[in-house]
Amino acid sequence: MKQLTILGSTGSIGTSTLAVVRANPQLFAVKALVAGRNVELMTGQCLEFRPAYAAMSDKRAAEELRLRLKDLNVATEVLSGEQAACDLAALDDVDQVMAAIVGAAGLLPTLAAIRAGKKVLLANKESLVTCGRLFLEAVSASKAQLLPIDSEHNAIFQSLPASLQQQLGYASLENNGIESIILTGSGGPFRDTPLVELPHMTPDQACAHPNWSMGRKISVDSATMMNKGLEYIEARWLFNATDAQMEVILHPQSVIHSMVRYRDGSVIAQLGSPDMRTPIAHAMAWPQRVESGVQPLDFTRMSAMTFAQPDYTRYPCLKLAMDASKAGQAATTTLNAANEIAVAAFLASEIRFTDIAALNVAVLDTLSCQEPQNVDAVIAIDREARAAAQALLPRFAAKRASVI
């Protein structure tokens, strides 16, 4: 029986992880749950899975959860704050940690799990985007095991030789006969929207992904293809890939989740239904396989699979991320922080959809940071970039108001 801590249990990855636990109660047990403010959902999760601990980032939410669980006679100990999340990620009797807190907020708890030598199921791509080299050094020093959860990175992982799977972040692709890694992306809901209409797209339209069911922030990132850009950065770190060893292509059907191109002309792809329970179940059970609850892919019901090159005019955020990856860790940290502010402002209807990329560019142009040498420096860059983005927001909000 594997004991599990879930960081971000009330989000889409967290609930999918619990669905896999539910499908395999003889294999997995929940030791601890960590979430933000969703007391209603966390109460239900504690009632069903009876974890020893639950932590909320918000102190008031934790107090409300504590009262609700007491009324329900649930013995789960309730904690609050960032340190509690870090402590639960490093519990002695926890075997694996699902790192699924969205954004830079997930960095320190994920690092705590790494430093404790846990098997870390990495869904928080920002850990590598903001802290790639330092993160992988911590993995190496602690002998922790890293398994990717993002459908694309999990697909790549499954398409790699076993020797490479054991050496994430350090093995040579070239020495293993690999020419390139091919990241696929659907292109989001605005793939065919006329460019002149993009400024007028609403948050609800941006969150209506054609294939995947996701949270609102990642749905907007999919619409801008910033999500693919962050995955590009993450893939370079995870698989020790150069810019020349990376390809990004559009695949609207989201059936092929990513591919690996080999020197002999072979291309190995991982296919499946667009359901995050598949990569989650794979990582939780690796190197074995378990039931995920996902409907099998029915090839007889599939339409043709199509592919195309991404248009950077339509997806400037993708190009921004690729360029930031070449510039270094300070640039990727700055971009990630600016984007989180920009997406939150768009979801609050404060700026237009196309202002997300424009605000990201403005913050990158404003800041000039030295490469971080430790986690504190990364956090400082993140904080500075967020402040710069907040300071620039009124300019874009005024522009939106003048258009309405």
UniProtKB/Swiss-Prot annotation:
<keyword id="KW-0464">Manganese</keyword>
<feature type="binding site">
    <location>
        <position position="222"/>
    </location>
    <ligand>
        <name>1-deoxy-D-xylulose 5-phosphate</name>
    </ligand>
</feature>
<protein>
    <recommendedName>
        <fullName>1-deoxy-D-xylulose 5-phosphate reductoisomerase</fullName>
        <ecNumber>1.1.1.267</ecNumber>
    </recommendedName>
</protein>
<keyword id="KW-0414">Isoprene biosynthesis</keyword>
<comment type="similarity">
    <text>Belongs to the DXR family.</text>
</comment>
<feature type="binding site">
    <location>
        <position position="13"/>
    </location>
    <ligand>
        <name>NADPH</name>
    </ligand>
</feature>
<feature type="binding site">
    <location>
        <position position="150"/>
    </location>
    <ligand>
        <name>Mn(2+)</name>
    </ligand>
</feature>
<dbReference type="GO" id="GO:0070402">
    <property type="term" value="F:NADPH binding"/>
</dbReference>
<dbReference type="GO" id="GO:0030145">
    <property type="term" value="F:manganese ion binding"/>
</dbReference>
<keyword id="KW-0521">NADP</keyword>
<comment type="subunit">
    <text>Homodimer.</text>
</comment>
<dbReference type="InterPro" id="IPR013512">
    <property type="entry name" value="DXP_reductoisomerase_N"/>
</dbReference>
<dbReference type="InterPro" id="IPR026877">
    <property type="entry name" value="DXPR_C"/>
</dbReference>
<dbReference type="GO" id="GO:0051484">
    <property type="term" value="P:isopentenyl diphosphate biosynthetic process, methylerythritol 4-phosphate pathway involved in terpenoid biosynthetic process"/>
</dbReference>
<dbReference type="Pfam" id="PF02670">
    <property type="entry name" value="DXP_reductoisom"/>
</dbReference>
<comment type="function">
    <text>Catalyzes the NADPH-dependent rearrangement and reduction of 1-deoxy-D-xylulose-5-phosphate (DXP) to 2-C-methyl-D-erythritol 4-phosphate (MEP).</text>
</comment>
<keyword id="KW-0560">Oxidoreductase</keyword>
<feature type="binding site">
    <location>
        <position position="11"/>
    </location>
    <ligand>
        <name>NADPH</name>
    </ligand>
</feature>
<feature type="binding site">
    <location>
        <position position="124"/>
    </location>
    <ligand>
        <name>NADPH</name>
    </ligand>
</feature>
<feature type="binding site">
    <location>
        <position position="231"/>
    </location>
    <ligand>
        <name>Mn(2+)</name>
    </ligand>
</feature>
<dbReference type="Pfam" id="PF13288">
    <property type="entry name" value="DXPR_C"/>
</dbReference>
<feature type="binding site">
    <location>
        <position position="228"/>
    </location>
    <ligand>
        <name>1-deoxy-D-xylulose 5-phosphate</name>
    </ligand>
</feature>
<feature type="binding site">
    <location>
        <position position="152"/>
    </location>
    <ligand>
        <name>1-deoxy-D-xylulose 5-phosphate</name>
    </ligand>
</feature>
<feature type="binding site">
    <location>
        <position position="209"/>
    </location>
    <ligand>
        <name>1-deoxy-D-xylulose 5-phosphate</name>
    </ligand>
</feature>
<feature type="binding site">
    <location>
        <position position="215"/>
    </location>
    <ligand>
        <name>NADPH</name>
    </ligand>
</feature>
<dbReference type="InterPro" id="IPR013644">
    <property type="entry name" value="DXP_reductoisomerase_C"/>
</dbReference>
<dbReference type="InterPro" id="IPR036291">
    <property type="entry name" value="NAD(P)-bd_dom_sf"/>
</dbReference>
<feature type="binding site">
    <location>
        <position position="37"/>
    </location>
    <ligand>
        <name>NADPH</name>
    </ligand>
</feature>
<feature type="binding site">
    <location>
        <position position="38"/>
    </location>
    <ligand>
        <name>NADPH</name>
    </ligand>
</feature>
<feature type="binding site">
    <location>
        <position position="151"/>
    </location>
    <ligand>
        <name>1-deoxy-D-xylulose 5-phosphate</name>
    </ligand>
</feature>
<feature type="binding site">
    <location>
        <position position="125"/>
    </location>
    <ligand>
        <name>1-deoxy-D-xylulose 5-phosphate</name>
    </ligand>
</feature>
<comment type="pathway">
    <text>Isoprenoid biosynthesis; isopentenyl diphosphate biosynthesis via DXP pathway; isopentenyl diphosphate from 1-deoxy-D-xylulose 5-phosphate: step 1/6.</text>
</comment>
<keyword id="KW-0479">Metal-binding</keyword>
<feature type="binding site">
    <location>
        <position position="227"/>
    </location>
    <ligand>
        <name>1-deoxy-D-xylulose 5-phosphate</name>
    </ligand>
</feature>
<feature type="binding site">
    <location>
        <position position="10"/>
    </location>
    <ligand>
        <name>NADPH</name>
    </ligand>
</feature>
<feature type="binding site">
    <location>
        <position position="186"/>
    </location>
    <ligand>
        <name>1-deoxy-D-xylulose 5-phosphate</name>
    </ligand>
</feature>
<dbReference type="Pfam" id="PF08436">
    <property type="entry name" value="DXP_redisom_C"/>
</dbReference>
<feature type="binding site">
    <location>
        <position position="152"/>
    </location>
    <ligand>
        <name>Mn(2+)</name>
    </ligand>
</feature>
<feature type="binding site">
    <location>
        <position position="36"/>
    </location>
    <ligand>
        <name>NADPH</name>
    </ligand>
</feature>
<feature type="binding site">
    <location>
        <position position="231"/>
    </location>
    <ligand>
        <name>1-deoxy-D-xylulose 5-phosphate</name>
    </ligand>
</feature>
<dbReference type="InterPro" id="IPR036169">
    <property type="entry name" value="DXPR_C_sf"/>
</dbReference>
<dbReference type="InterPro" id="IPR003821">
    <property type="entry name" value="DXP_reductoisomerase"/>
</dbReference>
